[in-house]
């Protein structure tokens, strides 16, 4: 494990290193909540856990800065628990093993948690700083952002006192975000009665892995391979040409990550197994050709293993309906933003498929900066899976964050950034969900901007943070807080 505590700036890396020792996957945050409250006590700042499970810290103004506008520093405490399939890491009990790799910090075959652990570490650094001059500062560290923005959605009105919100969940240094997409979760489910398999049939487990995966918002425009969509093309052909039957399917495990692995168990006549292996080899070549220049094609693995024939499988009519619905389901970019042609407006991610033992479940995350189109793609999915006899439910809907190019804090941030770096910052809207829109719905007076150091491949086991960006990010933060204007 690399000692990232020795990296500069020490204030950020020491606190981030401490965070990596505390398990904090979404949905299992008791340890990190206790850790943050204990940290605040040792730092001598007020802190409490609100009814939503968020941690709020308050640090009074430096003497002479009491009349400055109040600043809320905001980040989320949870991380996406993604890992290589053969990794033994337990996100609920094990610390993250960090590795320094040139100008990058990464983890050992797991997500790193820099999304949004670096934001949390920055809040910690501000709260414990003794030589930093600033007005009133609050830290809002939210719960379960990655699985539905629950902490922001349940944030009590009247809890925060600040005038400015600095969100620390942007992942490209030099970009200053003033708008983001809304989103909605779509879940299709079906209970079915399994049927007995033909005892004379063989069974194979077909695995597709080695895809990049990635963030289903930020990286959806790259056209990366979705393991579920690739798998359904093969399965549909195997069913049609080789009399294969579906026993089970497992693909993807995070709603907001492009699935990079999928596996199915198929039964089929023994005499067709060799033809199935040939078909898999052909599909592997096809995927390598289709995704050349997008995926690391030499890492793509697509193979079959002989397994014991399961006793039960999916009834043929239900199997065919499920395959058709998954095949027809839209995945990827649906529309680019008319006013910002380089930005995705609307997309969907066929994130998780679980079929077997009498239950089928499909989970999709749709995103759009246009509320009408968000509802359109959700009802499109509802139509698609309803035709397969599935029950479709919507949850976790949140609106987009509408840009305000006239923002005072944006102007101030851009001025300080140029003073320090000699170049103009880039003002951006992103095709990802940020908590800003939800917080603004409860605190509409806030002036908001989002920024942070560069992270690559968040939500994947390839996640990494660029070391050289963290020092200028911290320098910007310190000067911003010192120069916040008076009320």
Where do the protein language model's features map onto the residues?
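Acidic/His- and Gly-rich active-site-bordering loop/insert found
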Residues: 3-103
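Zn-dependent metallopeptidase/amidohydrolase metal-coordination segment
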Residues: 9-12, 338-341, 345-360, 365, ...
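Active-site metal-coordination/substrate-binding segment of hydrolases
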Residues: 65-163, 189, 203, 316, ...
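Active-site-adjacent substrate-binding region
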Residues: 219, 226-228, 233-249, 403-446
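Substrate-recognition/cap regions that form aromatic- and gly/pro-loop-enriched pockets
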Residues: 343-429
């Amino acid at each position: 494990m690399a000692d990232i505590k020795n990296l500069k700036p020490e204030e950020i890396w020491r606190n981030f290193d401490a965070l990596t020792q505390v398990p904090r996957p979404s949905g299992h945050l008791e340890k990190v909540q206790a850790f943050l409250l204990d940290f605040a006590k040792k730092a001598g700042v007020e802190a409490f856990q609100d009814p939503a499970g968020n941690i709020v810290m308050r640090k009074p103004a430096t003497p002479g800065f009491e009349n400055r506008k109040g600043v809320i520093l905001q980040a989320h405490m949870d991380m996406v628990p993604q890992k290589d399939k053969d990794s033994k890491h337990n996100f609920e009990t094990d610390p993250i093993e960090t590795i320094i790799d040139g100008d990058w910090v990464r983890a050992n075959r797991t997500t790193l948690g820099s999304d949004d652990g670096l934001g949390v570490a920055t809040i910690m650094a501000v709260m414990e700083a003794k030589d930093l001059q600033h007005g009133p500062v609050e830290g809002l560290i939210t719960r379960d952002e990655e699985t539905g923005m629950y902490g922001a959605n349940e944030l009590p009105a009247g809890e925060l006192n600040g005038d400015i919100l600095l969100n620390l969940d942007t992942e490209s240094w030099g970009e200053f975000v003033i708008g983001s997409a809304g989103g909605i979760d779509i879940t299709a489910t079906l209970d079915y009665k399994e049927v007995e398999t033909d005892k004379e049939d063989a069974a194979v487990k077909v695995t597709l892995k080695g895809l990049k995966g990635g963030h289903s918002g930020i990286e959806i425009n790259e056209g990366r391979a979705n393991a579920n969509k690739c798998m359904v093309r093969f399965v549909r052909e195997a069913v049609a040409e080789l009399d294969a039957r579906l026993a089970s399917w497992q693909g993807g495990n995070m709603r907001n990550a492009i699935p990079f692995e999928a596996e199915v168990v198929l039964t089929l006549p023994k005499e067709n197994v060799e033809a199935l292996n040939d078909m898999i080899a052909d599909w592997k070549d096809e995927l390598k050709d289709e995704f050349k220049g997008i995926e690391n094609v030499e890492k793509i693995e697509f193979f079959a293993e002989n397994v014991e024939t399961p006793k039960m499988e999916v009834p043929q009519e239900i199997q065919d309906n499920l395959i058709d619905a998954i095949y027809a389901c839209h995945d990827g970019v649906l529309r680019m933003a008319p006013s910002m042609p380089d930005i995705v407006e609307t997309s969907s991610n066929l994130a998780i498929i679980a079929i077997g033992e009498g239950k089928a479940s499909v989970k999709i995350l749709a995103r759009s900066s246009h509320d009408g189109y968000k509802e359109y793609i959700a009802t499109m999915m509802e139509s698609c899976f309803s035709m397969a006899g599935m029950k479709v439910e919507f949850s976790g809907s949140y609106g987009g964050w509408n840009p305000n190019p006239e923002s005072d804090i944006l102007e101030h941030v851009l001025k300080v950034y140029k003073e320090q770096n000699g170049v103009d910052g880039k003002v951006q809207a992103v095709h990802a969900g940020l908590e800003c829109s939800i917080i603004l719905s409860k605190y509409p007076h806030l002036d908001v901007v989002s920024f942070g150091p560069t992270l690559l491949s968040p939500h994947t086991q390839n996640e990494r943070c660029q070391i050289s960006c963290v020092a200028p990010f911290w320098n910007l933060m310190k000067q911003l807080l010192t120069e916040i204007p008076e009320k």
